[in-house]
């Protein structure tokens, strides 16, 4: 009987919660990464260099870094229903305003504010999952959720390419402006609906029966009824050294993720040539392959309980893919693109097992704060990598040094994960 209750509760939660969270995360990555496809248009219309483009891409994460922990405190204070709505509406506004910028400074301001508004979204979603799902289900749920990272690029790349390939203005807007406006409006609409679509705790959910609610309140990590969250609990999470170590490792992984995502369209264009729509179709291939493999890889990692080893191995594979792409960059476009596919698979399959480790360190407000530390410090890599690659591109006139930089970050982080986590019984960093 308890097993039947458990299965029924998890099935209902998975059907009701996960698709909506996947949609929200899809929109986040769409608005975060669509600028990569507008690089040439922004260069022509705003006079951006590669360094300036990298800076504009990366400054998003400065805003994200500065406001991540305060935003997580907002999730605790106001509850996910209200705070998710605030995040979605505000980020949608600034994502849309990107279509109206006229100078590099306006672009920098809008990208910075987009980061400020979106800050705390991912840790808040992880926190929300832990409220509803017991620990043993979280890696699988995160695996389903994080498929969205490559999937949003796989789906978003041809959409962005199609919009940018429009040959004339619509309603007075150039194609690059339409890209930001059309992809910025949906979060605003969904943000207005969010308070009616989600609840803050299993006990408030109408589609669960009494037995299912009772089981979840007893087994889900962060939904103890009647417990009051204090500031001291929150500060414990920030001071936890395990979270700080994971944050540093996350920095290296994020350098790979956002450095790769920001510069992939430009790299493919340099390798293969062609218009932006052709480039966007080629970009679909590595992202699509990564999306197919993220979930089975996360299931395998969860089954073996060697999360850190699996995450580290993925990062090493990604580094090999990037170095292979550099090696064949000028000699064989097909082989270079194949190595970029390997890099994408490695980068994105690393994410679910890696993020499942800090999610299981503690509970309550301490966990929310700790996850925010991991995310916000790690996301500094989202500024460093795109900007560094842009600077290297300007200095050398080649994409190769930038790709080697990303490969080095991933290789070092992956080897540290494997070295430390292989020693631990559960395959995670415990000391």
Region annotations inferred by a language model:
Residues 35-37, 233, 237-298, 351, ...:
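Extracytoplasmic gate region of multi-pass secondary transporters
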Residues 47, 79, 100-106, 117, ...:
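Helix-breaking motifs and short loop linkers at transmembrane-helix boundaries and internal kinks
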Residues 110-147:
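Cytoplasmic helix-loop-helix junction between adjacent transmembrane helices
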Residues 139-164, 186-187, 375-385:
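Glycine-rich segments within core transmembrane alpha-helices of 12-TM secondary carriers
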Residues 67-80, 292-306, 393:
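Helix-to-loop junctions at the C-terminal end of transmembrane segments
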Residues 307-357:
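C-terminal transmembrane helical hairpin of 12-TM major facilitator-type secondary transporters
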């Amino acid at each position: 009987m308890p097993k039947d209750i458990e299965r029924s509760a998890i099935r209902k939660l998975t059907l009701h919660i996960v698709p909506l969270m996947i949609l929200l995360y899809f929109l986040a990555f769409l608005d975060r990464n669509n600028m990569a496809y507008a690089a040439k248009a922004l260069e022509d219309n705003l006079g951006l260099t590669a360094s300036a483009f990298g800076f504009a891409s990366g400054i998003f994460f400065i805003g994200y870094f500065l406001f991540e922990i305060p935003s997580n405190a907002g999730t605790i204070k106001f509850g996910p229903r209200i705070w998710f709505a605030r995040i979605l509406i505000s980020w949608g506004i600034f994502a849309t305003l990107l279509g109206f910028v006229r100078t590099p400074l306006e672009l920098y301001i809008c990208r910075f504010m987009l980061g400020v508004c979106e800050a705390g979204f991912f840790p808040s979603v992880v926190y929300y999952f832990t409220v509803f799902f017991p620990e043993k289900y979280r890696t699988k749920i995160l695996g389903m959720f994080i498929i969205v990272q490559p999937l949003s690029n796989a789906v978003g790349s041809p959409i962005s390419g199609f919009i940018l390939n429009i040959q004339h203005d619509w309603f007075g807007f150039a194609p690059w402006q339409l890209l930001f406006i059309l992809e910025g409006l949906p979060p605003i609409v969904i943000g207005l609906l969010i308070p009616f679509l989600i609840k803050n705790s299993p006990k408030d959910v109408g589609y669960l029966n009494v037995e299912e609610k009772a089981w979840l309140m007893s087994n889900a990590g962060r939904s103890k009824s009647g417990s009051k969250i204090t500031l001291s609990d929150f500060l414990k999470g920030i001071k936890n050294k395990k979270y700080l170590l994971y944050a540093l490792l996350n920095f290296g992984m994020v350098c790979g993720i956002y450095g790769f995502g920001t510069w992939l369209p430009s790299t493919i264009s340099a390798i293969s040539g062609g218009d932006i729509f052709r480039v966007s179709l080629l970009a679909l291939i590595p992202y699509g392959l990564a999306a197919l493999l993220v979930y089975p890889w996360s299931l395998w990692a969860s089954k073996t309980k060697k999360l850190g080893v699996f995450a580290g191995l993925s990062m090493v594979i990604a580094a090999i893919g990037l170095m292979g792409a550099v090696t064949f960059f000028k000699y064989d476009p097909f082989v270079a693109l194949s190595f970029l596919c390997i890099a994408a698979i490695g980068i994105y399959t690393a994410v679910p097992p890696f993020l499942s480790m800090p999610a299981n360190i503690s509970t309550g407000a301490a966990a929310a704060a700790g996850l925010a530390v991991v995310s916000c410090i790690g996301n500094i890599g989202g500024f460093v990598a795109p900007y560094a690659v842009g600077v290297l591109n300007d200095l050398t006139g080649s994409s190769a040094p930038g790709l080697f930089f990303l490969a080095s970050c991933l290789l070092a982080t992956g080897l540290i994960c494997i070295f430390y986590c292989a020693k631990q019984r559960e395959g995670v960093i415990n000391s």
